Amino acid sequence: MKRIYVLFTALCICGALAAQDVKELLILHTNDTHSRVEPIPVTDPNPEYAGKAGFVRRATLIKGMREQNKDLLLFDCGDFSQGSPYYNMFKGEVEVKLMNEMGYDAGTIGNHEFDFGLDNMARLFKMANFPIVCANYGVKGTVLEGIVKPYVILEREGVKIGVFGLSPVLEGLVQTKNYEGVVFESPIEAAQRVAKILKEQEKCDLVVCLSHLGWKGEPYSDETLIANTRNIDIVLGGHSHSYFDKTLFYKNLDGRDIPLQQMGKNAVYVGKMKVEMEKN
């Protein structure tokens, strides 16, 4: 497929195009769902959250949207773990099996995935019917070797989509014994390397970053990531539990506006991004 342009119709930044000239992709995404298997209690003090979320609602929403668009993409940006007795008792098995039922296409690693150590992570990731991608954790020599990949390439209607993940500094967030042998690399350096591979070697039409770095802050966040990289077309975020009611745009190294979305926590919201891609 020839080189294509990425247009974000939700913000109406493109003009009218002939239908035959356009490929349309629908991306759904979650982050920091934190074992929210059941709805949030109606007694929750936050009226925006009370009585909302839960697996059944999320699965029903996704199923309905997939019936309208069978080629939609579904991603998770980390921290599906920790937050309910289900996780404490079954150590993530319930969450992964439910994600399998919902048909996720890829996910990245959040810090809470380490809460029961590497052996448990390997068990869960093998159980997942979707790839786990993380470009900035070196896992050679650990039980995660061969399970966690830096990126995955998906295809929808002839469009090649490269998807890679970025995860946070573990020191201070995770007990040392729970990530022994995992080597952290600067997410900016990892992103530059992998995004270039996806664009130039793999010839991907669209490059999506699943980030668990958090929205703002130094030295590593989605803001600093976009400002210091190129070849990334979309960043879907997590970790900071930030809810965006609209897509944010930040300029990359080439001065391009790169879209960023994040959907709070506990799967109260599922992110939706509609992408129109025009052939060159």
Question: Where do the model's predicted regions map?
Answer:
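Sec-dependent N-terminal signal peptides
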Residues: 4-13
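Acidic, metal/ion-coordinating pockets
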Residues: 19-280
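C-terminal segment of classical bacterial N-terminal signal peptides
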Residues: 13-19
